[in-house]
């Protein structure tokens, strides 16, 4: 019996005397295939399978005991030696038992490996099994602390920038107030200069009026003198010739008339002066009102302009702060995305490696399952072979005569090898039976 090898037939002569043999095959005498070999160069002849002789007409087909299911013609087995079949029964059984024990040991080791691989697969497939990932928590804490410091520094910088801008706005306010006060001072000085010119004109007008009054006084004095001279001349001409009594009003006191005229002129002058002063006061008041309203409007416009400037600067500062905050948030988002993408890539690599290991384990498991099935088939064939050997031994023990060496050998008998080229390698020796031999 040979395992994992091709069936080998032994012959010392070609099968020339057997009818129906188309071809004759040869193999070395007294050879049988050793386990785990397929060449006939390492074959040995088991002594327990030898027959002294077989009938010449023994050409009935026999089958391989290892499940080869291919018939071979059995004549006189030239690979069977002279001797008794029962002489090597113990050695044969020992040999078969050793082979069976080795196969069982191999099956047991493969089952242990299979169980170990199943345990590993079960551990890998457990859903709640924690994935071993590197601990980056302290790095995350450091990064978060630095980010907080950066945000605090940015906020402090923004606050200082706001304070600087507020100081600039206050300086601009004071500068604008100084400019407005300077413009008001210049306007007041211009008004004072204009009023001084008006005062000079009024002084000149007053001088002219006083000179006119003096000239009128001189004219009045001249008129009085002329009237007195005329009166005296008329009196001298009339003399005492004419005495005229007129019932007329009493004579007018010239001093009184002059005083009245003086009072009248003084009243007119006072009225004119009062009117001029009122006109000047009204014009001055109107100019002051216009100046005040213009100053108020200018101050309101300047205040509104400063307020708008302040609002524009505040909005610009807020815009810069929001842009800085947006940039910092975008940087933070980019860093977070890069960090999570790195973690995702690491997890994906870990998943790929685990899947690769799982695929390798599955391949190993399938391969070991195939090997296990092959070993189970081999075990079944071995058990069948052992049972066959046991039955053959029992039959041969019952059929052999007391003197097993008395039989005469039959010449020109061979055992034909399996002619089916598609047959699988037999896992047992070729058994030559004599059940169908023609007597």
Swiss-Prot record:
Subunit structure: Heterotetramer of two type I and two type II keratins.
GO cellular component: intermediate filament
One Pfam family it belongs to: Filament
Record-linked InterPro entries: IF_conserved, IF_rod_dom, Keratin_I
Function: May play a role in late hair differentiation.
Residue ranges of the region described as Coil 1A: 90-124
Chain intervals for the UniProt region annotation (Linker 12): 237-252
Region Tail: start-end pairs: 397-439
GO molecular function list: structural molecule activity
Family that this chain belongs to: Belongs to the intermediate filament family.
UniProt xrefs under PROSITE patterns: IF_ROD_1, IF_ROD_2
Region (Coil 2), start-end ranges: 253-396
Note: There are two types of cytoskeletal and microfibrillar keratin, I (acidic) and II (neutral to basic) (40-55 and 56-70 kDa, respectively).
Region of interest (Linker 1), ranges: 125-135
Head, as annotated region: 1-89
Domain IF rod, residue spans: 89-400
Site label Stutter, positions: 338
S-S bridge residues: none
Region span, Coil 1B: 136-236
Superkingdom to which the source organism belongs: Eukaryota
Keywords: Coiled coil, Intermediate filament, Keratin
Identification of the protein by name: Keratin, type I cytoskeletal 40
